[in-house]
């Protein structure tokens, strides 16, 4: 066993320096075989032999076995192990309790300088010479805390006056003693990769212990390097903390702007009062309410207008039907009278029948004329109680089986406008002939009746296009996909077309014609060359590849127009 001096921090110093009142003498028991300090657990746990000696667990496992027994290394007494071996030997609990007290409990009356916490939270250290005084300096040679008065008294001799005394703030760190070799201070750090033990080591650990042959460095430079990295990390953490705090403040401000709240303001006479400040959420809700209120008002007006159109149609239709009822009543009365007159004539004698010949002839001629008129009226008038209703995209109502749409077909000369028109009208191919003036045809498709105006595309006729814009609901612009050199000219004319105020709300359908010709531009290429996404921004437009000869793609274009123009299909209202 060896004698160590343990201070309050658990660090040991040489026993030759026991004269300081800031230290206490404590007997620390070591294993008598390996001379390592006993531990509370692990391989260095103290275990009792039958003879009363204590040896660490690790050394007991290394002793030679004599059957099922071992001999004490000190007095050679035999101890039976039993089935459990060394694990079955009792631990020295008295020694374990002492070790635990040394590690966790206070040192005693001769312990290191007592520290206490002041009211302000700062550490207060008592003077080692006079505990009534507060220490202000530290003697690095005596390792004592002293007040200024005691420092002068205790170091008044020439020998002790040479001791270095520093303020408590500059007190050097006390050396930490090695846990395995407590008489030696920790001086090195192990840098060996894969080392499983603690990196701290003394000179004995470095030369002879578990760190023998390991890479190492001196403790102080290694600690200073780690401190420098910690300082850098602390600076980064402070910067990061400031960024987080700034971002958090911004988040708080954003939340306040969204939620709104009460704000203290001053009026004209300097009186402070609270005022509600609406947030962006409340403003957004108000905007939505206002928008849908206006939308509701607009829909109500459109509903009233649509109902008035239906009422007018019903009123006119009922007036006409009642007029037809009156006409049919009169006609039926006349026919009945003529029939009755004929029956009476049949009952008279021959002379009177002969005399009534001319009258009967005129009566029959009148009946034949009335029958012919009735047949013509009945053939042209369909007696149907349904009221077909169609709604446009702008919520206007159209009554009738077909909704009429005015369409203007424009484009450069030779693009195939007239060919497309007659293919849709008569489903037959027409040889290209330059259009002088215009062509107009009606094309019925689904529940729509397109009135299509085909205007000539020669350069001298293009200024006349503007005369056909009035009340136009859709523009069909035809492009010749096979003539690359005229795409820029088509782009120029289309750009002029889209600046017309009368066509501001008109739909734009672009037919990329002659897709059957070899080398024709694709729809994507024409879209790019005409800059349609930029040119038609804010407008409802669509480009459709087609072939006027075969009709490919033409009805797909009409389908798009139908979907854009009609909000709902034809509704039969009984």
Swiss-Prot record:
Parts forming coiled coils: 352-379
Catalytic activity line of the entry: S-ubiquitinyl-[E2 ubiquitin-conjugating enzyme]-L-cysteine + [acceptor protein]-L-lysine = [E2 ubiquitin-conjugating enzyme]-L-cysteine + N(6)-ubiquitinyl-[acceptor protein]-L-lysine
Pathway: Protein modification; protein ubiquitination
EC annotation from Swiss-Prot or TrEMBL: 2.3.2.27
Zinc finger (RING-type): 31-76
Cited InterPro entries: Bbox_C, P-loop_NTPase, Small_GTP-bd, Small_GTPase_ARF, Small_GTPase_ARF/SAR, Znf-RING_euk, Znf_B-box, Znf_C2H2_type
Record-level GO BP terms: innate immune response; intracellular protein transport; positive regulation of autophagy; protein ubiquitination; vesicle-mediated transport
Effect of residue 458 to I: Suppresses GTPase activity. Decreases interaction with PSCD1
Region ranges (ARF-like): 390-574
A Pfam family assignment: zf-B_box
UniProt zinc finger (B box-type) residues: 122-168
Binding, GTP: 411-418, 454-458, 513-516
Family per record: In the C-terminal section; belongs to the small GTPase superfamily. Arf family.
Function: Acts as an E3 ubiquitin-protein ligase. Plays an essential role in autophagy activation during viral infection. Mechanistically, activates TANK-binding kinase 1/TBK1 by facilitating its dimerization and ability to phosphorylate the selective autophagy receptor SQSTM1. In order to achieve this function, TRIM23 mediates 'Lys-27'-linked auto-ubiquitination of its ADP-ribosylation factor (ARF) domain to induce its GTPase activity and its recruitment to autophagosomes. (Microbial infection) Mediates TRAF6 auto-ubiquitination in the presence of human cytomegalovirus protein UL144, resulting in the virally controlled activation of NF-kappa-B stimulation at early times of HCMV infection.
Record-given protein name: E3 ubiquitin-protein ligase TRIM23
Organism: Homo sapiens
Recorded name of the encoding gene: TRIM23
């Amino acid at each position: 066993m060896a004698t160590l001096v343990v201070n309050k921090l658990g660090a040991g110093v040489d026993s030759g320096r026991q004269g300081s009142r800031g230290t206490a003498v404590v007997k620390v028991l070591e294993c008598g075989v390996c001379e390592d300090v006993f531990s509370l657990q692990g391989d260095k746990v103290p275990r009792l032999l039958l003879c009363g000696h204590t040896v660490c667990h690790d050394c007991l496992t290394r002793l030679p076995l004599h059957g099922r027994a071992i001999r004490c290394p000190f007095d050679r007494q035999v101890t039976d192990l039993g089935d459990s071996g060394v694990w079955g030997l009792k631990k020295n609990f008295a020694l374990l309790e002492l070790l635990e007290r040394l590690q966790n409990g206070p040192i005693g009356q001769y312990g290191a300088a007592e520290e206490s916490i002041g009211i302000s939270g700062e550490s207060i250290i008592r003077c080692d010479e006079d505990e009534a005084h507060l220490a202000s300096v530290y003697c690095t040679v005596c390792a004592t805390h002293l007040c200024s008065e005691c420092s002068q008294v205790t170091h008044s001799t020439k020998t002790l006056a040479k001791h270095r005394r520093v303020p408590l703030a500059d007190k050097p760190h006390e050396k930490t003693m090695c846990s395995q070799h407590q008489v030696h201070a920790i001086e090195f750090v192990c840098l060996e990769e894969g080392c499983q033990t603690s990196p701290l080591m003394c000179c004995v650990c470095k030369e002879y212990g578990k760190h023998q042959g390991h890479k190492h460095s001196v403790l102080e430079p290694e600690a200073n390097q780690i401190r420098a990295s910690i300082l850098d990390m602390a600076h980064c953490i402070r910067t990061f903390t400031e960024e987080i705090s700034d971002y958090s403040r911004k988040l708080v401000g954003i939340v306040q702007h969204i939620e709104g709240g009460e704000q203290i303001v001053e009026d004209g006479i300097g009186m402070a009062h609270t005022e509600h400040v609406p947030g962006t959420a409340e403003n957004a809700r108000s905007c939505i309410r206002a928008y849908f209120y206006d939308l509701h008002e607009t829909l109500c007006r459109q509903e009233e207008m649509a109902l008035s159109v239906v009422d007018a149609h019903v009123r006119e239709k009922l007036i006409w039907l009642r007029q037809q009822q009156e006409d049919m009543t009169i006609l039926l009365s006349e026919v009945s009278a003529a029939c009755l007159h004929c029956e009476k004539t049949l009952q008279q004698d021959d002379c009177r029948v002969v005399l009534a010949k001319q009258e009967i002839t005129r009566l029959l001629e009148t009946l034949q004329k009335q029958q012919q008129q009735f047949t013509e009226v009945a053939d042209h008038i369909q007696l149907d109680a349904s009221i077909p209703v169609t709604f446009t995209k702008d919520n206007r109502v159209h009554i009738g089986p077909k909704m009429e749409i005015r369409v203007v077909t424009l484009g450069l000369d030779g693009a195939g406008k007239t060919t497309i028109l007659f293919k849709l009208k008569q489903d037959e191919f027409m040889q290209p002939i330059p259009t002088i003036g215009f062509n107009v045809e009606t094309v019925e498709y689904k529940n729509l009746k397109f009135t299509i105006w085909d205007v000539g595309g020669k350069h001298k006729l293009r200024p006349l296009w503007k005369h056909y814009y009035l009340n136009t609901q859709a523009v069909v612009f035809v492009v010749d996909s096979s003539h690359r050199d005229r795409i820029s000219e088509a782009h120029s004319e289309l750009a002029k077309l889209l600046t017309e105020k009368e066509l501001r709300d008109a739909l734009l359908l672009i037919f990329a014609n002659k897709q059957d010709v070899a080398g024709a531009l694709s729809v994507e290429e024409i879209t790019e060359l005409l800059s349609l996404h930029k040119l038609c921004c804010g407008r409802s437009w669509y480009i459709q590849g087609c072939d006027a000869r075969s009709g490919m793609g033409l009805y797909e274009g009409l389908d798009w127009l139908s979907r854009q123009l009609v909000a709902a299909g034809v509704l039969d209202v009984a």
